[in-house]
Design a protein with these regions (language model features):
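Flexible "cap/lid" loop of the alpha/beta hydrolase fold
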Residues: 188, 197-223
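Active-site loop/oxyanion-hole signature of alpha/beta-hydrolase fold enzymes
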Residues: 132-174
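Conserved alpha/beta-hydrolase catalytic His-Asp/Glu region
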Residues: 208-210, 225-284
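Alpha/beta-hydrolase fold catalytic core
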Residues: 2-103, 128, 345-353
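Catalytic histidine-centered segment of alpha/beta-hydrolase-like enzymes
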Residues: 324-333, 337
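Short beta-strand/loop motif that positions the catalytic acidic residue
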Residues: 285, 291-293
Length: 353
């Protein structure tokens, strides 16, 4: 049996080791948070004057644009690209479809580009003139020259973009996730310019985003495939990740490769946190609007979101997409495309203004 002094000494050693371990973990977490801030979310003032802005370096710009061009080769239909100049900077627009078809503007999710719609554009371009944009304050080929601080800055950007594209007041507008939130803001801002709107799993908008979304987003900002897949892909895109066919796995690889290279290449800062629309704002939506959500959505409960809309804004058409989560435009692309086309072309879905 050990003497009491030796037992106490051993306990103190274990305690010191435990405290040292905790301290090391805290330091590592703090260092990681500092790295995330300075690597990803640092403000633009220090770099906006550089010739390679919004990229971290000339080399990063060249590597990213080369990758982007190769990925563009997977766009399944013919397209014309335009760089549109506005007072906020320049916006890259990928245009497909027939000139005399009704216009459909596509706004991607945060951290994505116009290439997000690769699985959808073939069906949509048969019926619409597609304007797929790279968000001016996100990854891709667009480049802002002024800061974005309020939703009104985004609205001014879209106003000028639509004016320069000579889009008349019959625009169909569709956005996914963060792009869905931007679309909802524009529905409130300029309903007279829109024909119809489609909100696909819009970030916040209907229900507040969960805290889990935040910490998963931070961890998935680590440019590592294993971490990104475990932390974000298998959570938000679990229906797609569960598929073992080559097309699904290629879609996941493309998604992760795009995101990891963008994280390494860009100085990025999300300018405006997506907000939940008030009951009054939802009630005031007068243009025909479709809300699409996957049954396995993780940013909020699909059932709760539709229940709120049915209660406060029954004029908004709602649809739940089976066997899909936040990946619904990919894992159920044909069904989503069909729902969108039917809604946008349905004469019974008329303006209630």
């Amino acid at each position: 049996m050990l003497p009491k002094k030796k037992i106490k000494s051993k306990k103190r050693s274990v305690t010191r080791l435990f405290l040292a371990g905790c301290g090391t973990i805290v330091v590592l977490l703090l260092a990681f948070c500092i790295w995330v801030y300075f690597s990803l979310f640092s403000g633009q003032d220090a770099i906006q004057t550089s010739p390679h802005y919004p990229f971290k370096s000339v080399e990063a710009k060249e590597k990213y644009l080369d990758h982007y061009e190769k990925r563009s080769q997977k766009w399944p239909v013919a397209y014309e690209d335009q760089m549109i100049q506005t007072s906020q900077g320049e916006t890259f627009v990928r245009i497909s479809g027939f000139d005399d078809a009704p216009p459909l503007v596509l706004i991607p999710s945060a951290g994505a580009t116009s290439l997000l719609w690769t699985q959808n554009v073939e069906m949509l371009a048969d019926r619409f003139k597609i304007y797929a944009i790279d968000n001016i304050y996100d990854f891709g080929r667009s480049r802002n020259t002024r800061p974005f601080e309020t939703p009104n800055d985004l609205m001014l950007w879209l106003d000028e973009l639509f004016d320069t594209l000579a889009l008349e007041n019959n625009i169909n507008l569709m956005g996914l996730s963060y792009g869905g939130w931007i679309s909802s803001q524009y529905v409130l801002h300029a309903p007279e310019r829109l024909h119809k709107a489609v909100l696909i799993a819009p970030a916040a908008t209907i229900i507040q985003l969960p805290g889990e979304w935040a910490w998963r987003g931070i961890l998935s900002a680590i440019p590592n495939k294993f971490i990104m897949r475990k932390v974000m892909v298998e959570w938000a895109f679990k229906d797609l990740a569960a598929k073992d066919d080559a097309a699904s796995q290629t879609a996941i690889d493309d998604l992760m490769n795009d995101a990891i290279l963008a994280i390494k290449s860009f100085k990025f800062k999300m300018p405006i946190h997506p907000t939940v629309l008030s009951d009054h704002e939802l009630e005031s939506i007068s243009i025909p609007t479709l809300f699409l959500v996957g049954e396995n959505e993780v940013i909020y409960s699909a059932g709760d979101a539709i229940a709120r809309l049915n209660l406060v804004a029954p004029q908004i058409k709602t649809e739940i997409i089976p066997n899909a989560g936040h990946d619904l435009t990919v894992v159920q692309s044909e069904l989503v495309n069909t729902k969108v086309i039917e809604f946008l072309l349905d004469p019974m879905q008329s303006d209630s203004r």
